[in-house]
Design a protein with these regions (language model features):
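Residue-level detector of well-ordered alpha-helical segments, enriched
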Residues: 3, 19-23, 50-53, 215
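Conserved AdoMet
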Residues: 25-103
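Non-catalytic nucleic-acid substrate-recognition regions in nucleic-acid-modifying enzymes
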Residues: 1-20
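Conserved SAM/SAH cofactor-binding pocket of Class I
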Residues: 92-192
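Residue-level signal for the nucleotide or nucleotide-sugar donor/cofactor binding architecture
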Residues: 49, 89-92, 143, 147, ...
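Mobile active-site "lid"/loop adjacent to the S-adenosyl-L-methionine
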Residues: 184-215
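Generic alpha-helical structural signal
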Residues: 5, 9, 52-56, 95-99, ...
C-alpha cells in the first residue's frame, strides 16, 4: 500500500500550474479529510477504495477537467458552493463584481437582481453580506436554478431566491435598486475556448454572437 506522501509525490499533472494543490485537494476529498491532515500524517496509508477513488479523479484532472467539476464544489467569496458541469465555475475574478456591488449601495432594505445566476455565486455572496437586501437570481437553464436553490438552502440564506427566466423575460416589469450580471462575453470561434478548463465549461454560458457583445447589449438596452 502507498502512503499519503507517496501518492502525492507520484501524482503527475504536467499541464496544471497548480499541480501539487490539485493533487492535495483530490486526495483530501478522497480521504474525507482536510489538506492539513495530509501534512500531519504523510506516512498513513489510505484504504484501497480511497486510493482507487483518488486515482480515478487524478486521471480526470490529467485530461484537463477542472478540480471543481471533479469534486462538485468550489469556494467563492466566503462560501462553499456546489457546482456542476451545466454552470460556470465561480472564479476569484468575479468576486470583484461582489465588492463593487457592496460599495455602491448601503445595507438598507432593497431588491437586487442577478441575471444569469448560474450556481448562485454572486447572488448568494451579496445575500450573505447584506441581510437586509432581497436578492433574486434568474437563469434560463432550469438545472442551474435548481443548483442555485440547493446552495441557498444549504447556506440558509432566506433573503435570496431563484427562478427561471431568460434575462428579463419572466420578471414582468419588476424594478430593482441594482442589477448585477456576468453574461456570456466570448465570440463564437474564439481560440481561447479550446484551452484549459474552458473546454469543460458550458458553451452557452461563455459564447454569444455579435463578437461577444449581444447579451451585454440586450441587458443594457
Amino acid at each position: 500500500m502507498a502512503s499519503i506522501q507517496s501518492l502525492l509525490e507520484n501524482a503527475t499533472l504536467p499541464d496544471s500550474p497548480t499541480a501539487r494543490l490539485d493533487a492535495e485537494l483530490l486526495l483530501a476529498a478522497a480521504l474525507g479529510k482536510s489538506r492539513s491532515y495530509l501534512h500531519t500524517w504523510p506516512e498513513r496509508e489510505p484504504a484501497p477504495q480511497q486510493a482507487q477513488t483518488f486515482a480515478g479523479w487524478l486521471a480526470r484532472r490529467q485530461q484537463g477537467e477542472p478540480v471543481a467539476y471533479i469534486l462538485g464544489r468550489q469556494g467563492f467569496w466566503s462560501l462553499d458552493l456546489e457546482v456542476a458541469a451545466h454552470t460556470l465555475i465561480p472564479r476569484a475574478d468575479t468576486e470583484l463584481l461582489v465588492e463593487v456591488a457592496l460599495q455602491l449601495l448601503p445595507e438598507t432594505p432593497m431588491h437586487v437582481l442577478d441575471l444569469g445566476c448560474g450556481s448562485g455565486a454572486i447572488a448568494l455572496a451579496l445575500a450573505a453580506e447584506r441581510r437586509l437586501w432581497q436578492v433574486q437570481g434568474v437563469d434560463r437553464i432550469v438545472a442551474a436554478v435548481d443548483l442555485a436553490e440547493r446552495n441557498r438552502q444549504r447556506l440558509a440564506l432566506s433573503n435570496a431566491s431563484f427562478s427561471p427566466s431568460h434575462w428579463f423575460d419572466a420578471l414582468h416589469g419588476q424594478r430593482f435598486a441594482l442589477i448585477v450580471s456576468n453574461p456570456p462575453y466570448i465570440a463564437a470561434g474564439d481560440a481561447y475556448l479550446v484551452h484549459g478548463a474552458l473546454r469543460f465549461e458550458p458553451v452557452c454560458a461563455l459564447v454569444v454572437g455579435g463578437c461577444g457583445f449581444d447579451d451585454i447589449r440586450g441587458i443594457i438596452v
